[in-house]
């Protein structure tokens, strides 16, 4: 880069041979900062790309595709090139090109008979399945309707890790509730760590029962999970509010959801529900915690698109449960007011950090080990989020029951639903030639006020229609 005397041209590809978006080198960002006034040109002039007969055909294909998409910026050059190939006796090639241009990689809606079968087999739907449908309807179709699965390989993956840690947390919190009357302050560090290790070992043995694993790999993973388990329980104990008491653990639910003339059951498991009972004010405050073995944050933009429904729906389910358990058979004047105070994700981890000493390392870990979610700073805002989650779930089920299985993977910034999809070879999603399109997220989480306003408008309109 330092050798040119007169001019330096920098270029980069935007798309790989398999039509996947490619990010440019980090060097280009540095160059842009050094020369902020320099303009970036998008590609070569059309005529400069025509070098051989083959490259000319490629340029012609791009030009015709632009015309089909309503882009007439190269119309004159494309028509001239078409006439040139037609004149030189390439009519057969042009006919094949024309047929190829009509190719569309678009699935049709499912027939009514098929959707009737779906209604029979899927009257119970997990919230995670709805999120998958919102992420990409076609991937949902392949996985849950056709039931295509990757070859099962016995081994270790994130699902195993999640099951082990979830099971250990459930046992630990039940132990403190049943044996210590929820008095976490009476639990010594030695007893806490010993019980955590015991519960992790129990769940580890249960999860991998009957499987042959490499002894070394097995032991490294087991010790790692014990370390994560101890760190998680230690942190959750430290964050324990004196007012709130953990009451519900791994609560499996079935929530009725009205979809048109049909009823569907939403199913799921709530990791933890904490209660604060204020007898003087006759109120019960609810806090819902959902454990995650991977990094996860609550995002209003994702909730709006249907990608983030779990936490809000789980919180609404727990609100109904608490109301039923505490207010059943009570007179109207004696009923508790149920207040949903907050809903959080907690990432179960023992993060590696860079620091000068152990004190700084511990402080860095503390900053990462926090609840992430939504607190009830504004009652109307919180209730809008819960109401919108139920509305969006109903809307997704309605779309699903009508047979829509579009290849519409969600795209947000540089992330797409296709990035880790197991069905790429079946789907063959292709923006360039298959007429496939990404579904871009409408709002980012930063547009909080606009998001809440639209959610409120949608929910308010739905209530008026149901009257």
Q: Locations of the language-model features?
A:
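Conserved helicase C-terminal RecA-like lobe
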Residues: 1-3
């Amino acid at each position: 880069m330092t050798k040119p005397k007169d001019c330096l041209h920098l270029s980069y590809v935007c798309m790989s041979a398999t039509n996947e978006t490619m990010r440019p080198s980090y060097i280009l960002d540095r160059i842009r900062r050094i020369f902020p006034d320099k303009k970036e040109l998008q590609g070569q002039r059309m005529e400069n790309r025509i070098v051989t007969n083959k490259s000319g055909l490629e340029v012609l294909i791009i030009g015709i595709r632009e015309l089909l998409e309503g882009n007439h910026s190269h119309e004159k050059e494309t028509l001239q090139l078409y006439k040139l190939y037609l004149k030189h006796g390439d009519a057969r090639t042009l006919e094949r090109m024309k047929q190829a241009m009509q190719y569309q990689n678009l699935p049709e809606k499912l027939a009514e008979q098929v959707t009737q079968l779906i209604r029979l087999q899927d009257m119970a739907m997990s919230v995670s399945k709805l999120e998958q449908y919102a992420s990409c309807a076609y991937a949902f179709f392949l996985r849950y309707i056709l039931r295509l699965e990757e070859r099962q390989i016995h081994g270790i993956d994130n699902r195993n890790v999640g099951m082990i840690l979830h099971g250990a947390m459930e046992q630990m919190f039940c132990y403190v509730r049943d044996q210590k009357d929820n008095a976490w302050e009476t639990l010594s560090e030695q007893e806490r760590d010993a019980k955590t290790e015991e519960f992790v070992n129990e769940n580890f043995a249960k999860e991998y029962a009957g499987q042959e694993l490499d002894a070394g790999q097995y032991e490294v993973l087991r010790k790692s999970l014990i370390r994560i388990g101890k760190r998680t329980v230690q942190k959750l104990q430290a964050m324990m509010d004196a007012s709130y008491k953990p009451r519900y653990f791994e609560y499996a639910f079935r929530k009725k959801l009205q979809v048109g003339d049909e009823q569907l059951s939403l199913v799921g498991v709530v990791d933890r529900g904490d209660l604060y009972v204020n007898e003087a004010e006759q109120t019960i405050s609810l806090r819902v915690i959902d454990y995650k073995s991977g990094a996860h944050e609550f995002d209003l933009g994702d909730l709006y698109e249907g990608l983030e429904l779990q936490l809000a729906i789980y919180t609404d389910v727990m609100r109904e449960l608490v109301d039923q358990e505490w207010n059943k058979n009570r007179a109207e004047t004696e009923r508790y007011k149920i207040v949903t105070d907050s809903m959080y994700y907690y990432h179960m981890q023992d993060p590696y950090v860079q620091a000068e000493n152990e004190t700084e390392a511990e402080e860095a870990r503390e900053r990462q080990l926090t609840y992430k979610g939504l607190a009830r700073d504004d009652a109307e805002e919180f209730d809008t989020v819960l109401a919108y989650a139920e509305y969006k779930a109903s809307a997704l089920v309605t779309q699903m029951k009508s047979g829509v299985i579009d290849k519409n993977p969600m795209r947000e910034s540089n992330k797409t639903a296709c990035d880790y999809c197991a069905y790429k070879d079946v789907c063959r999603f292709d923006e360039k030639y298959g007429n496939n399109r990404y579904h871009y997220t409408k709002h980012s989480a930063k547009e909080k006020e606009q998001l809440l306003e639209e959610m409120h408008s949608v929910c308010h309109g739905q209530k008026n229609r149901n009257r």
